[in-house]
């Protein structure tokens, strides 16, 4: 396990029209990578592409709804062909689902699982044989602190991110003795538009948020480094505390919600 130098690499990144994806794409381009951008919002994606092309002129973009899993898999191969190959796949696209459990529908859960978990799986399985054939590749999965901690009013979102964390961990074991590497990014509260999506309840969390550039720097470090899991910012102590005494964690979070603190 050794990482890949970003300069000169080709990186395909989903959810690239805003937030963590856009910040990561811009930074990767500035560091010398050719980037392939995937997103739903063509206008925003084109603006990010313009920024990337000023540093990496061969960068490309594809507009795609990753809720369509067949389209996601096809797109991964189309992007591979257009870029020549893909050294690094960054599965970053995600949607929120902010609902107290009594308001959650099966449709909410299916939508969160499809975009946040099944689409990264579809794209990974599409490119993995080609990465194997080339003998090089890194899959970077952007999960969430909510992929290690249960969060109030975010059961569907947490389920999708726990799934992505578990998948990444098991995949890293399966690929451990191969040249294909896996990285898992666990962002904490980051200042992106995921907090204010139309149709979502207001998130319970109302504390400080880090800029997406904090995660972008971490993504670059993860690609070039050799560690599997990266908490950005480093809130792993909360996860360790939960693991040490989960009953206290559950009671403590519930008490904070009930008192509004």
Residue ranges of predicted features:
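Conserved glycine-rich cofactor-binding loop
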Residues: 17-18
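Conserved glycine-rich Rossmann-like NAD(P)H-binding loop of the short-chain dehydrogenase/reductase
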Residues: 31-48
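The beta1-alpha1 cofactor-binding region of Rossmann-like NAD(H)/NADP(H)-dependent oxidoreductases
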Residues: 63-74, 106
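Substrate-binding pocket helix/loop in short-chain dehydrogenase/reductase
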Residues: 100-101, 105-110
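Active-site helix of classical SDR
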Residues: 124, 160
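Residue(s) in the substrate-gating loop at a strand-loop-helix junction
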Residues: 144
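SDR active-site lid
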Residues: 172-234
